[in-house]
Curated annotation (Swiss-Prot):
Compositionally biased region (Basic residues): 73-87
Comp. bias (Basic and acidic residues): 63-72
InterPro entries referenced in this protein's UniProt entry, alphabetically: UPF0239
Region of interest (Disordered), ranges: 50-87
Segment forming the signal sequence: none
Record-given protein name: Protein anon-73B1
Transmembrane segments: 25-47
Topology within the bilayer: Single-pass membrane protein
Pfam families (UniProt xref): UPF0239
Keyword terms: Membrane, Transmembrane, Transmembrane helix
Main localization of the protein described in the UniProt heading: membrane
Location of the protein in the cell: Membrane
Family of this protein: Belongs to the UPF0239 family.
Length: 87
């Protein structure tokens, strides 16, 4: 029993920082809160369903049907505009 008490005293004497101050506690719990916030944001982005009523942005690369214009012509126009932008 005295050997364990002596080893605890020796371990306590090696601890050069002692008790944690308020700043280290603030940093530790702030990191936990930040990790929780990131987890919530990522899970919301993954699990959130798309709203079917929302209008899609035409610049996202999705091709939608237009009246009287075949799909092949639209794809050609999109590729041509992208090539022109790269110049």
């Amino acid at each position: 029993m005295s050997a364990s008490a002596d080893s605890l005293a020796a371990a306590a004497s090696l601890d050069k920082y002692g008790d944690e101050d308020i700043f280290s506690l603030l940093i530790r719990y702030g990191l936990y809160v930040g990790a929780l916030f990131q987890f919530v944001c990522i899970s919301a982005a993954v699990l959130m369903e798309n709203n079917p009523d929302s209008q899609s942005n035409p610049e996202t690369g999705e091709v939608t049907e237009r009246e009287g214009e075949p799909v092949r012509t639209r794809l050609h126009k999109i590729r041509k505009l992208e090539k022109k932008k790269r110049r």
